[in-house]
UniProtKB/Swiss-Prot annotation:
This is Holliday junction branch migration complex subunit RuvA. The RuvA-RuvB-RuvC complex processes Holliday junction (HJ) DNA during genetic recombination and DNA repair, while the RuvA-RuvB complex plays an important role in the rescue of blocked DNA replication forks via replication fork reversal (RFR). RuvA specifically binds to HJ cruciform DNA, conferring on it an open structure. The RuvB hexamer acts as an ATP-dependent pump, pulling dsDNA into and through the RuvAB complex. HJ branch migration allows RuvC to scan DNA until it finds its consensus sequence, where it cleaves and resolves the cruciform DNA. One of its GO terms (biological process) is DNA recombination. One of its GO terms (molecular function) is four-way junction DNA binding.
Length: 191
């Protein structure tokens, strides 16, 4: 099992990227926020999950063990494949996704592409209370600026859950960000 690779980002493609490691180019599928953060020509370490399917081997890459653990937890639900798991990790920051799973918040899970009400309810039911505590560590408390940014994004027509997820992720990176900065960066991610 390949659990970690370090190498050069050779090329970014739709839904994944090619990582040159040890003279071999590996294609890794990855969540959208991770893909957007990657730069071609830069070295990166990637936590991986290798999946054997009828069509062959598929490799999935994540920026940290937290994302990888959530991906594997989601795959444990019947009816959830790698495409849905990646969609959830692309739509919601890891800590918000972990919180939604812990609390069984199916409504928040439906903000991911390809996750309908029934599937969200199944995920929420099967994983409610099963999220390891370390995935919730370091949760950030929302600020007034974050709440203002979420309301502004909702007024612009974005789903509140999706806007909140992106704003919380941005706030985790910069806890002192002002509302207008959060809105500006969130718009880049949401478009």
């Amino acid at each position: 099992m390949i659990r970690y690779l370090r190498g050069l980002v050779l090329k970014k493609e739709a839904g994944g990227f090619v990582l040159l490691a040890g003279g071999v180019g590996f294609f890794l599928q990855a969540p959208t926020p991770f893909l957007q953060a990657l730069e071609e020509g830069k070295e990166v370490g990637v936590h991986t999950h290798l999946l054997l399917k009828e069509e062959g081997l598929s490799l999935y890459g994540f920026p940290d063990e937290e994302n990888l653990a959530l991906f594997e937890l989601l795959l444990s639900v019947s009816g959830v494949g790698p495409k849905v798991a990646l969609a959830l990790l692309s739509a919601l920051p890891p800590r918000l996704l972990a919180r939604a799973l812990l609390e069984g918040d199916a409504r928040l899970l439906t903000s991911a592409s390809g996750v309908g009400r029934r599937l969200a309810e199944r995920i929420a039911l099967e994983l409610k209370g099963k999220v390891p505590p370390h995935l919730l560590a370091g949760e950030k408390v929302e600020s007034e600026a974050a709440e203002e940014a979420v309301m502004a994004l909702a007024a612009l027509g974005f789903k509140e859950a999706q806007a909140r997820a992106v704003v919380l992720d941005l706030l985790a990176q910069n806890p002192k960000a002002r509302a207008q900065d959060l809105i500006k960066e969130a718009l880049k991610r949401l478009r």
